[in-house]
């Protein structure tokens, strides 16, 4: 990774910070993005390698801010080899009761924000002769999760557009990798499944660490994979849902309060 430049959105904590650390540990220069500049800077110091890392404020819902950080990254490092779309938010509610504005805001960050970042960085990658775009999605983008259905919908959409973009950008030597983690032991994940009537019980999911997701992401990048599902034990669940959705729905129903 020496000489490579990696940009990570939503990098102030959790998966984003862990991904930034893994790539930096392998020799890459890393730009950490977060809506809160001070939190991005704090994460940068936790990541280390401060001589080749940069922290910038960026709200992925704002195309002007995305274009600004693309320009600054090119100014400081002359290139962008990898862009990681990790920024995301979640809401916990039933489809019948959710507020439409909250649902729209969810899509603005989780889906439209990722698409805007892709569109902003592709020209630089084309000019450089290639690159990699990594979308941090979710197993919930394969198997809808009750009372997290709006979140699942954003990840279904992200999975589809990432895999479609992969086909479209192959001729430009740009690989698009989709990473689908299961339940993760992060602040974000604990909020998503916090105890509440109608939510999936947190004790029913042990969860994996952000560091494990980051390592799987790096390996997927290194091998130019199309998709990574982590942990591997979720792969049979995804395949089973495709073949026998009723059986998976029965099992999920038993986990709902």
Question: What are these language model-derived features?
Answer:
Residues 138:
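Residue(s) in the substrate-gating loop at a strand-loop-helix junction
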Residues 94-95, 99-104:
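Substrate-binding pocket helix/loop in short-chain dehydrogenase/reductase
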Residues 171-232:
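SDR active-site lid
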Residues 37, 57-68, 100:
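The beta1-alpha1 cofactor-binding region of Rossmann-like NAD(H)/NADP(H)-dependent oxidoreductases
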Residues 5, 12-13:
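Conserved glycine-rich cofactor-binding loop
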Residues 26-43:
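Conserved glycine-rich Rossmann-like NAD(P)H-binding loop of the short-chain dehydrogenase/reductase
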Residues 118, 154:
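Active-site helix of classical SDR
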């Amino acid at each position: 990774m020496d000489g490579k430049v990696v940009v990570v959105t939503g990098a102030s904590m959790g998966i984003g910070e862990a991904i930034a650390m893994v790539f930096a540990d392998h020799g890459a220069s890393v730009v950490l993005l977060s809506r809160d500049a001070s939190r991005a800077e704090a994460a940068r110091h936790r990541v280390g390698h401060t001589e080749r890392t940069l922290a910038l404020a960026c709200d992925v819902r704002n195309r002007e801010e995305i274009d600004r950080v693309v320009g600054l990254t090119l100014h400081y490092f002359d290139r962008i080899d990898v862009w990681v779309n990790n920024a995301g938010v979640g809401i916990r509610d039933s489809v019948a009761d959710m507020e439409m504005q909250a649902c729209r805001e969810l899509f603005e960050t989780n889906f439209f924000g990722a698409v805007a970042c892709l569109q902003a960085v592709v020209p630089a990658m084309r000019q450089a002769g290639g690159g990699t775009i990594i979308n941090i999605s979710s197993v919930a983008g394969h198997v809808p999760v009750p009372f997290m259905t709006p979140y699942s919908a954003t990840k279904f959409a992200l999975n589809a557009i990432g895999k479609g973009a992969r086909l479209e950008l192959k001729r430009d030597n740009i690989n698009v990798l989709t990473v689908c983690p299961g339940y993760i032991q992060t602040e974000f994940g604990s909020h998503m499944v916090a105890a509440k009537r109608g939510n999936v019980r947190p004790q029913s999911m042990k969860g994996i660490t952000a560091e494990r997701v980051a390592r799987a992401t790096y390996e997927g990048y290194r091998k130019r994979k199309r998709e990574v599902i982590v942990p591997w034990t979720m792969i049979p669940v995804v395949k089973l849902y495709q073949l026998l959705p009723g059986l998976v729905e029965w099992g999920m129903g038993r986990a709902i309060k």
